[in-house]
Amino acid sequence: FVGHSMGGMIAWRYALDNLDQLNGLIIIGSAFFGNEQEFENFQTINAPPVAFELIESKFFIRLLEYITPRILVKEGISQSVYDQSIVTDELVDQFHDIILMEGTRVAVGRLAEVHEDDFIANPLDLRKITIPSLIVHGEEDNLVDIKFIDHFIEQIPNAKLISYPKTGHMIPMEVPLQLSEDIREFIN
């Protein structure tokens, strides 16, 4: 089971409840919080892009359902990657087009409804994840500082960490060949 970013949170939560259905777990650019203080520290250290802050406002959530300025998309991507040379007009257009697809903006708005309790769990619960697990992180991740993956490494018995230098949050875009090779090696 593979998850990136918030999908990583979904992946480890799914793994806790469905270990018998999984052969392995891959968590990419995701965080784990063992208590409210860790979550508050995360929010203090990691400055989200303006677009992410806007979805916390009910007014902007409704507004973004109808208009999504391209500049917000570009700013969100720029803050999520280490190497700014990959933030091309073509990439921004691709992301913007995806956001403009029917239902996407409503779904993004629903992210604001996720409660902080959804992000917090007992670190000891991770010990239940006994399947081989690969934890992947960018060392220059501005959205999820690498220190917020410690619980994965400390508590998951069969966890292996791979961190990429000069890589931000968008690992699949920033180092796609290296990531796919590392995943292939992990699976084999």
Each predicted region: which residue ranges?
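Conserved alpha/beta-hydrolase "acid-adjacent" motif
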Residues: 142-148
